[in-house]
Amino acid sequence: KRRPPGFTPFR
């Protein structure tokens, strides 16, 4: 899977 730069599933 590819995630965009700065992808934050958790903060």
Curated annotation (Swiss-Prot):
InterPro entries listed in its UniProt record: Bradykinin (IPR009608)
Example of a GO cellular component annotation carried by this entry: extracellular region
Keyword terms of this UniProt record: Bradykinin receptor impairing toxin, G-protein coupled receptor impairing toxin, Hypotensive agent, Secreted, Toxin, Vasoactive, Vasodilator
Expression across tissues: Expressed by the venom gland.
GO terms, biological process: defense response; regulation of blood pressure; vasodilation
Record-level Gene Ontology MF annotations: hormone activity; toxin activity
Major location category of this protein: secreted
Pfam family, one: Bradykinin
Family: Belongs to the bradykinin-related peptide family.
Role this protein plays: Induces relaxation of arterial smooth muscle, by targeting bradykinin receptors (BDKRB). May cause hypotension.
This protein's name: Wasp kinin PMM1
Protein species of origin: Polistes major
Lineage, opening ranks: Eukaryota, Metazoa, Ecdysozoa, Arthropoda, Hexapoda
